[in-house]
């Protein structure tokens, strides 16, 4: 028995295929989903989702930009603000964006709370894309 996994962003369906296992970046940490999982509705943080289609296959990585996941009767539906498959991300561009976002985060004034929030969001987004592309473990 397998899971039916769908990742849907406002502009496209990023993933719609069966899977043996899914790991999600929930707001409280990594969340593993296998067949027979209890019903669940959870918020997702910006991060990397990992999907394994079959037991002997490699993990597929998808960068998620926050959203929600619902698990019910071996169906995993993931609604996100944005998503990008790791195999579609240019590693060097993702590395450059990550380095730029990290530098921007380190340069923000500790007194400018709004700038800190924006820089942190940009860093999390760049880190997720870089990780999904295979740049960070």
Curated annotation (Swiss-Prot):
Keyword set includes ATP-binding: no
Keyword Transmembrane helix: no
Topology relative to the membrane: Peripheral membrane protein
Domain of life: Bacteria
Subcellular location: Cellular thylakoid membrane
Keywords for the protein's UniProt record, in alphabetical order: ATP synthesis, CF(1), Hydrogen ion transport, Ion transport, Membrane, Thylakoid, Transport
SUPFAM superfamilies (alphabetical): Epsilon subunit of F1F0-ATP synthase N-terminal domain
Annotated GO CC locations: plasma membrane-derived thylakoid membrane; proton-transporting ATP synthase complex
A Pfam family it matches: ATP-synt_DE
GO MF annotation terms: ATP binding; proton-transporting ATP synthase activity, rotational mechanism
Cross-referenced CDD domains: F1-ATPase_delta
NCBIfam families: ATP_synt_epsi
Primary role: Produces ATP from ADP in the presence of a proton gradient across the membrane.
Oligomeric form and interacting partners: F-type ATPases have 2 components, CF(1) - the catalytic core - and CF(0) - the membrane proton channel. CF(1) has five subunits: alpha(3), beta(3), gamma(1), delta(1), epsilon(1). CF(0) has three main subunits: a, b and c.
Family, similarity comment: Belongs to the ATPase epsilon chain family.
Name of the featured protein: ATP synthase epsilon chain
Name of the coding gene: atpC
